[in-house]
């Protein structure tokens, strides 16, 4: 999602390595037991890759964090070639653009002050009051009083749209069910022969891209509470419901979110909002409704930051926001669900 030198730390996101070490296969359409809080090694492999100091940059990594214009603005980042992403690569002429959005500088509750303010003394790499400033990827370096993005250069300094200096923690609930026919039978893909998994997707209002419903962890809030709250707000429009409706939604969500689940990913995210000094980290968790009965009793309704919400078939054709497609692929692999019509691609992983 302080001061020790990090290497290139390009977010190469070596999920193929993670998948090779943790993916559990089962026969097609057979329910896969989901032990609570599994998949820790997935986060380990990616975290180790980011923090390793490797000098090699892959063209398909750390891309969204270098895109221009910066979201919600006309600001163009300084261009960062693949071979110069990593901090270990010397680049004396590196001249990133400085940008922090007006909405952040206005000083809302969710945002830090400017580093230059005399009364602001953040405790980086540790819990700072109610604000979690520790990274899920390990220690990050501080340079000239500012945290340095562990994944490398982005062409932009400041915070952009992000409120916190350093890691900005989010939570992404991935709610899944099996696609079924009118008789209630699971539907298999005609090519792969595997059952088709569906997940709840929202269309973001800010950029129009489809995404996993999720959001920022409030100060002092537990991840489990964030996961449930964000799903209720964005996929069920709970903020606009009456007290009685909210209680009913809460009861049904409790049944779903208190069951066995899979922690799919924890750590840095290649996100278009990232800067050299502020970046997104997330914990993506899969809650699976095996029978479909729980979600059948909940009506999807877009709310808060979501413009639309719907069930989406999972496949490699999905085009999703930030790193969400990678998270969804991990879920498909773990559930032994359909992902690709290319059997070779299925066996290779990402």
UniProtKB/Swiss-Prot annotation:
Signal peptide: none annotated. It is an enzyme of class 3 (hydrolase). It comes from Mus musculus (Mouse). The keyword Protein biosynthesis does not apply. Residues 178-334 form the Nudix hydrolase domain. One of its GO terms (cellular component) is nuclear body. GO terms for molecular function: ADP-ribose diphosphatase activity. This is ADP-ribose pyrophosphatase, mitochondrial. Monomer. Interacts with GLOD4. Its cofactor is Mg(2+); Mn(2+). The keyword Magnesium applies. The lineage of its organism: Eukaryota, Metazoa, Chordata, Craniata, Vertebrata. Its main location: mitochondrion. Belongs to the Nudix hydrolase family. NudF subfamily. Hydrolyzes ADP-ribose (ADPR) to AMP and ribose 5'-phosphate. Residues 53-78, 117-153 are annotated as: Disordered. Residues 1-46 form a transit peptide. SUPFAM superfamilies: Nudix. The modification Phosphoserine is found at residue 121.
